[in-house]
């Protein structure tokens, strides 16, 4: 049985997305490979960190003044009392994400003033 590339390509053109997905999975399992794109070199990671323009504010601990922290979280996020309490109780958790550096620092200062431990990511 000769392998005819043109016939294979023609069959793939007529296949559905579901069939193609199953084919990829079967090839990955059979040949122990992955279809994922290769990751960029580590040198590019340093440049990406220097040019970071989006920050997440993470509450790592509520501290001793939990009520003040919950009040501040409500003001920052617009959450209700129950949701804000659950967020604070679930620390470490992200309070707000996708912020500019100045916005993230402003929120960090407010929460730290209320007694929380904060990290910016």
From Swiss-Prot:
Family of this protein = Belongs to the bacterial ribosomal protein bL12 family.
**UniProt signal peptide:** none
Please describe the quaternary structure of this protein. Answer: Homodimer. Part of the ribosomal stalk of the 50S ribosomal subunit. Forms a multimeric L10(L12)X complex, where L10 forms an elongated spine to which 2 to 4 L12 dimers bind in a sequential fashion. Binds GTP-bound translation factors.
Designated name of the protein: Large ribosomal subunit protein bL12
Taxonomic path: Bacteria, Bacillati, Bacillota, Bacilli, Lactobacillales
This protein's encoding gene: rplL
Biological role stated in the UniProt entry: Forms part of the ribosomal stalk which helps the ribosome interact with GTP-bound translation factors. Is thus essential for accurate translation.
| GO cellular component assignments | cytosolic large ribosomal subunit
Task: List the Pfam families hit by this protein, alphabetically.
Answer: Ribosomal_L12, Ribosomal_L12_N
Transmembrane region(s)? none
Keywords in alphabetical order: Ribonucleoprotein, Ribosomal protein
Domain of life where this protein originates: Bacteria
Q: Which GO terms describe its molecular function?
A: mRNA binding; structural constituent of ribosome
One BP term from GO: translation
């Amino acid at each position: 049985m000769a392998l005819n590339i043109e016939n294979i390509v023609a069959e793939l053109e007529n296949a559905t997305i579901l069939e193609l997905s199953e084919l990829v999975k079967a090839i990955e399992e059979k040949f122990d490979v992955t279809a994922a794109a290769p990751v960029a070199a580590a040198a590019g990671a340093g440049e990406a960190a220097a040019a970071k323009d989006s920050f997440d504010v993470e509450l790592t601990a509520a501290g001793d003044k939990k009520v003040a922290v919950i009040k501040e979280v409500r003001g920052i996020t617009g959450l209700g009392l129950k949701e804000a309490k659950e967020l604070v109780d679930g620390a470490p958790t992200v309070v707000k994400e996708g912020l500019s550096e100045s916005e993230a620092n402003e929120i960090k200062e407010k929460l730290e003033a209320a007694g929380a431990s904060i990290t910016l990511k």
